[in-house]
Structures are given as C-alpha cells and as structure tokens.
C-alpha cells in the first residue's frame, strides 16, 4: 500500500505525486471521500488516475492510497438477475444502503451479497486430483441457471475437504492440498482482473447459428454462437430495439446486457419488460438468465470505459462453466468517447477525429474475447461468447473511426438504414449493404441438421432483392408498366419478401419472434409463388392475370407472420395452395 497526495484535478483525471511504489492498473482510493480510481499512466513518481466517481470538491493536497490490486470483478452465485454499474457495484443494494436514488460517492459495497446463503452440492469427493477449471459442485442460482463452482486458475492438487450445505460466498467450502504442500481454502466466489482475458484450453471455429427470431438476421445475415457482430446506425434507426430483441429471444443460456453511455430510460425499459417476458426455450422469465450492467449517460464518463470489460469478464466466467453467452454492448461509440476524453486529458497525440491512436487495438481486445472455446479442466466442455455491439456514428456516417475499426474485426455487419426507418420498415437492416461472413458455415450447418435446401433458398431470395435494386432506377425513369412481364413479377415478389417477410413488428406478441421452422415455411411459400408464376409466364399467361388469380393466397402468405408457432401446418399448407391457384389461372386462360 502506497500513499501519495493529489496535485491536479481535471474532470475524471486526477494526478498524484509520491506514488513511486504504485503500478499501472492499480486501484486507488482518492481524496478524503475515498473515491475509486485506477492508475492509467506513471511518470516518475506521478500517477495519472482515472476516477470512476464524480470528482467535484476534490482538491490538491488530499491523500491517494493504492490498494495494490487491479480493477477486478467478483464472480460467484448472485450475478444472475442482478443490476450492476460499470465497476460492478450492485445498484439495488447500493440504493438500500445509502437510502438515495443517486450514487453517493465513496461508498464501498461488495458486488456479491455477503449475507445470502446458497445451497452447494458437491460433485467431487475427498482424495480426487483436481486442476484449474474442474467443476467442484453446483449451486442452483435461478430456476434456469445451475451455477458451477470451478477450481480457480493456477490452483491444482488433491481435494482434502469439501462440504455440502448452505454457505455465503465467503465461507470456506473446499480445501485443496497443492503440490508445494500448502492448503488452498476456497469459497463459492473468485475474483478476476477485468482487463485480463480468462485462459482457455483451445479456441474453436464457431459453426452453430445463434437463432435470434428476427427473420432478416437469421435468414440473410446470421451470426454464430461465438461470433462477433456490429449494429451501426443513425439516431432513431432501431439499434436498441434490435439489441433488446436479441437479448430477449436468442437461443443462449446467459445474456449480459451492458448499457454503456446510453439513455437511462432504455435500461428502464429492460427492467420493466424482461421480468414479464417468457423465454421460449425454458418457459421461465428472461431475467432468470440475464445480468444487467447499467452505465447510463448521466453516470461518470470514466466508468463507461470499465463497464465493457466488466461485462465481458462476467461473460467469460459463465462461458468457462460450459454455457453459451451473448453479450450486448449498447453502445460502443459512447465507450470510445470515454477513451477519447481520457486520452485528451492525458495530452496524448490524437488520431482520427480526436480518438486515441490505440482505439483500434482496444476495440479488437474486446471483440477477440468472444469466441467458441474448449475450457480448462479435466472434464471436457465447450462454451461460447457471442459479442454484439451497437455503434452510434454521428449522423449515421459509417466512415468514422469507431465504425471502421469495429468492421475490421467483426464478421457480421447489420447496417441500419435511416431511409428504411423513415419508411417505418423495421428492423431497418439494409439487405444490400449488410453482410455476414458466417453465411456459408451457417447454411451448410442448417442443411446438414435440417436435411433441407435452406442455403439455396436464401441465395434465391437475395438474388430477387438484388435484381429489384437494379430495376428500381429504370422504374423511376419510365414506370413499372414498361418492364417485361418477368421483371414485373420480380418486383412483385421482391416487395413480398420485403413487406411480408423482412418487416417484423417487435411489439406484436406473435410477430416479435419467429422460430426457424416458421421462417423456412414462410420463405418457401414466397419462393414457390415466384417459381410457379415464372413458369406460368413462360407458358404464355399474363402477369396481371396471375396477380388477380392469386390475390387471396398472396394475402394469406402476407398474414402468415401473425400465425402462432403451434399452427405451423397452416403456413406449410399454403405451398400447395399457391401451386393450385396458379394452375387454375392457366386453366382459365386455356393454357
């Protein structure tokens, strides 16, 4: 422990002298109030400290005490359904302890509840050899999540004691005799530095799709479990709703939602909606699998920078248990702005638009902690982290540094489009500018698992949309009626794909989520209409006759998005109805 004194205060940056024994990334207690800060730069005996609380009223001469430890999070039972701030302070217990709706400065509250007792069930017995990552036992944390207590990193040896029963997170639950003869006494909780990624046995290639229930994503721009995706878009394009939809319905075990520098009412929406929503995979409340990290725009800027790392470290902990985890960061642009502010106050050489020169490497550090891995431990298991980051470029300009650095790393780009949002087409993901580099892997995985021709259907549907885009300029110049019959059909089918398939109402109880079998049935109906109508045109039928003769079945295809999942056979039955009605048109015309 080293004590210095403040010489300069500049917003969230405090410079202290007499800190020659301190290290970079040490946590400090700043001023008489004991504010939490982290050393981010050392020059001789002077330390530059990033303070995670409001610094007003702090002045030169006040003491600074280092703890000698890096910024770390507590990992153990009690994380699920909890809401933390950027440095893992529990907001509900903070409010009860301080009796204030605002963050009182200098208050230290442990992240995990020290009074709560958890029922621990051992899975190993005394005398067994254990290594780091082995599962010692379990705690049923919620109705959905079984919390697996693991041997901490760098601990191995013989299990000499393990107890069943109800324990707090600090009680000694097991003892391990290590190779040097020392006894390690372990509890239900472990700590981990947030800026250091948790070690794994092996990184694997992600192949299994993350099913989100959003048709435009699952069909055209899928992300895998263990993948990384970015959602850039201008104000009002629907970034937050896309993030909320994925958090609600993605087929993962755990969701970490990081509200980083965005509006507080968005976190309020999460708190109001999530407890009432039922997870379609488990039948339980979605909050039973969710961890919330709230660092809204009215909270200290410096803590935004920590919130992303706090979230990804908690995600890695659950991944090491063998769970699939999705982490949503809304928005990484606000996090980058916090980096820019601290860099400016440190008087570092600025890069593009004032962002620090190391912006790209910091963004890469975050997204590279996602992935599919084989975890440590003698019991073989796999875990995944899927990282989905919203980016808020000013004015929707994706050429700005945060978006460009993000796109260099992630493999999925869901580009939200202001003109689509203005036309009330939601989700406003532009199918011509977005891309997914997982498309081939996911397509072959689904073809193999479902024994279907899914990837071929997706290719055909995208070809229709691209053909529509190439015809649009001709239509604007000379009108729709001047096109050939075949091109008029292409325009009509493309409109069906856009309005009846890609458009989705997040606030409709049925349309908000579409399972994969339902997506396939809906797309098959539209493509069958295109195929049969195209054949009819080649046999001599007229476009207008086909459209009039199939008006009823096309209306039913359009309404199929509102048919509940349990009535899937109704949607599948429309395929034969389409063929029958087009044959009827041909017969009526004597063809």
Curated annotation (Swiss-Prot):
Produces ATP from ADP in the presence of a proton gradient across the membrane. The V-type alpha chain is a catalytic subunit. It comes from the Bacteria. Gene3D superfamilies: 2.40.30.20, 2.40.50.100, Bovine Mitochondrial F1-atpase, Atp Synthase Beta Chain, Chain D, domain 3 (1.10.1140.10), P-loop containing nucleotide triphosphate hydrolases (3.40.50.300). It comes from Streptococcus pyogenes serotype M2 (strain MGAS10270). ATP binds at residues 233-240. PROSITE patterns: ATPASE_ALPHA_BETA. The gene is atpA. Belongs to the ATPase alpha/beta chains family. GO terms for molecular function: ATP binding; proton-transporting ATP synthase activity, rotational mechanism; proton-transporting ATPase activity, rotational mechanism. Its EC number is 7.1.2.2. PANTHER family: H(+)-TRANSPORTING TWO-SECTOR ATPASE, V-TYPE PROTON ATPASE CATALYTIC SUBUNIT A. The lineage of its organism: Bacteria, Bacillati, Bacillota, Bacilli, Lactobacillales. One of its GO terms (cellular component) is proton-transporting ATP synthase complex. Keywords: ATP synthesis, ATP-binding, Hydrogen ion transport, Ion transport, Nucleotide-binding, Translocase, Transport. GO terms for biological process: proton motive force-driven plasma membrane ATP synthesis. It is an enzyme of class 7 (translocase). This is V-type ATP synthase alpha chain. NCBIfam families: PRK04192.1. It catalyses: ATP + H2O + 4 H(+)(in) = ADP + phosphate + 5 H(+)(out). Pfam families: ATP-synt_ab (PF00006), ATP-synt_ab_N (PF02874), ATP-synt_ab_Xtn (PF16886), ATP-synt_VA_C (PF22919).
């Amino acid at each position: 422990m080293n004590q210095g004194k403040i010489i300069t205060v500049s917003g969230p940056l405090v410079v202290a002298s007499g800190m020659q024994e301190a290290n970079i990334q040490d946590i400090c207690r700043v001023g008489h109030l004991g504010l939490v800060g982290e050393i981010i730069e050392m020059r001789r005996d002077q330390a530059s400290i990033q303070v995670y609380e409001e610094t007003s009223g702090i002045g030169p001469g006040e003491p600074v005490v280092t703890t000698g430890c890096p910024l770390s999070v507590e990992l153990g039972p009690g994380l699920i359904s909890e809401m933390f701030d950027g440095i893992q302070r529990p907001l509900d217990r903070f409010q009860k302890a301080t009796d204030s709706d605002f963050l009182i400065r200098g208050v230290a509250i442990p992240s995990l509840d020290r009074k709560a007792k958890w029922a621990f069930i051992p899975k190993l017995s005394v005398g067994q050899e254990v290594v780091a990552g082995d599962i010692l036992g379990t705690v049923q944390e919620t109705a959905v999540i079984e919390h697996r207590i693991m041997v901490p990193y760098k601990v191995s040896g013989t299990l000499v004691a393990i107890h069943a029963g109800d324990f707090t997170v600090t009680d000694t639950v097991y003892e391990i005799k290590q190779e040097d003869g020392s006894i390690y006494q372990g509890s239900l909780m472990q700590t981990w530095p947030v800026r250091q990624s948790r070690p794994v046995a092996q990184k694997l290639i992600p192949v299994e799709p993350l099913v989100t229930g959003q048709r435009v994503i699952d069909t055209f721009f899928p992300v895998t479990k263990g993948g990384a995706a970015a959602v850039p878009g201008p104000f009002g394009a629907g970034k937050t709703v896309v993030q909320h939809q994925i958090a609600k319905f993605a087929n993962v075990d755990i969701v970490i939602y990081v509200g980083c520098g965005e509006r507080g009412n968005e976190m309020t929406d999460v708190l109001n909606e999530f407890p009432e929503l039922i997870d379609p995979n488990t039948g339980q409340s979605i909050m039973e699998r969710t961890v919330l990290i709230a660092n809204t725009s009215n909270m200290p800027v410096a803590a935004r920078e920590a919130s992303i790392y706090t979230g990804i470290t908690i995600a890695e902990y659950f991944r090491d248990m063998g769970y699939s985890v999705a982490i949503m960061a809304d928005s990484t642009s606000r996090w980058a702005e916090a980096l820019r502010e601290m860099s400016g106050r440190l008087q570092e050489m600025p890069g593009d638009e004032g962002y620090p020169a190391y912006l790209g490497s910091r963004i890469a550090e975050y997204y590279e902690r996602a992935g599919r891995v084989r975890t440590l431990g003698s019991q073989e298991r796999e875990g995944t982290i899927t990282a989905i980051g919203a980016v808020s470029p000013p004015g929707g300009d994706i050429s700005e540094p945060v978006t460009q650095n993000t796109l260099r790393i992630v493999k999925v780009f869901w580009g939200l489009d202001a003109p689509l949002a203005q036309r009330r087409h939601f989700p406003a993901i532009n199918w011509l500018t977005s891309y997914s580099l997982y498309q081939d892997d996911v397509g072959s995985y689904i073809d193999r698992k479902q024994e279907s021709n899914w990837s071929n259907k997706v290719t055909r549907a995208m070809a229709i949309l691209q053909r529509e885009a190439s015809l649009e300029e001709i239509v604007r110049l000379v009108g729709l009626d001047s096109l050939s019959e075949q091109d008029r059909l292409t325009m009509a089918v493309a409109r069906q794909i856009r309005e009846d398939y890609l458009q989705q109402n997040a606030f409709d109880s049925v349309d908000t989520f579409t399972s994969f079998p339902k997506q396939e049935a809906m797309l098959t109906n539209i493509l069958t209409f295109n195929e049969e109508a195209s054949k009819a045109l080649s046999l001599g039928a007229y476009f207008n006759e086909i459209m009039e003769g199939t008006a009823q079945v096309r209306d039913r295809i359009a309404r199929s998005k509102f048919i509940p999942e349990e009535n899937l056979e109704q949607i599948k039955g429309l395929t034969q109805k389409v063929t029958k009605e087009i044959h009827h048109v041909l017969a009526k015309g004597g063809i």
